[in-house]
Amino acid sequence: MLAAVIHRHTVPFEPAISDGIQTVRIRAMPFRLLSPAHWPTWLLIAVAFFVVRLPIRYQFRLGRLIGNLLHRIGGRRTRIATQNIELCFPDLSAQERARLTKQVFESTGIAIIETAYTWLRPVDALLPRVRFHGLEVLQTAVNEGKGALLVGAHFAVLDLGGAFLAAHFDFDCIYRTSRNSVIDHISLRRRNSLYGHVIERSDMRGTVRQLRQSRTIWYAADQDNGRQHSVFAPFFGIPAATINVTSRLAKISGSPVIFMSHFRDESDCSWSVRLRRVEAYPTGDEIADATLMNRIIEREIRSHPAQYLWLHRRFKTMPDGTRKY
């Protein structure tokens, strides 16, 4: 989930109380981030600084090369992606699944560059390349004055998609950090400039308070966070641990739920952002709500199957305790 699991020993941030909520604000960069242990990361960032200034078509080409390299190297993420695709697309032949796995890595390579672009450059120059569908849907929800839950998933264009929408709407996000301190510093600094508040996942009261103050809050609802915070609902026909926070927040706050998806089109170097209202939600049944949300996510994935983060362990927690990976 695009949520704040804060690793206090690695993250150069400070919690701040703002309007009654605990937000994540970046401090000035600690000198320890300049230690030799972090030089490889800084070198990659320096390279990325120049890469994101290339023409978009060359950024896409380079991203595909990076993805192919990661795929050839193999390792744990390749095994996870391969297993996920076998589980979710059993009707594909072995050759088709292998081709899709390769495309997933190519898309992931492009996403790495897109994420670097989001962190290192303003996205204004890309906005003419973005097709928005449903901006009026979100505007209508905001006008109701009950706040809005902007629910997403880990499609490839995650950070860039949020930045595109932030050019049109003021909203907050729930944030999950990386274990890399330098990456955390850069990404959190950028998110603080893009969004109204960057909220810790643990601050549920603050999240509800923001909704009641008519704020829109964005987060991803498609990762396996274990049994404690989940119910089991079908995802591609497989019972998957699915967070129940969306159902609970919608019930407590009365906020409308908007689903956001975002994809790239390599044929013309463009992107699309789609916003759709989730009707008749919540139902009062958390499993039914989770099933509906998974169905929506699955439908969007099927439209662009290579542009989903199949590299994460979506089926890490099983109802019977078995292991898929």
Residue ranges and their predicted role:
Residues 115-116, 154-158, 300:
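Juxtamembrane/interfacial segments around transmembrane helices
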Residues 144-202, 227-234, 268:
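Catalytic core of membrane glycerolipid acyltransferases/transacylases, capturing the structured
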Residues 25-26, 30-35, 64, 70-73, ...:
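Non-catalytic C-terminal accessory region of glycerolipid acyltransferases
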Residues 79, 177-181, 239-243:
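Active-site metal-coordination segments of metallo-dependent hydrolases
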Residues 46, 80, 136, 160, ...:
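Short Gly/charged-rich anion-binding patches and loops
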Residues 1-28:
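N-terminal amphipathic/basic-hydrophobic helices that include classical n-h-c signal peptides
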Residues 21-152, 186-189, 193-195:
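Membrane-anchoring hydrophobic helices of lipid-metabolizing enzymes
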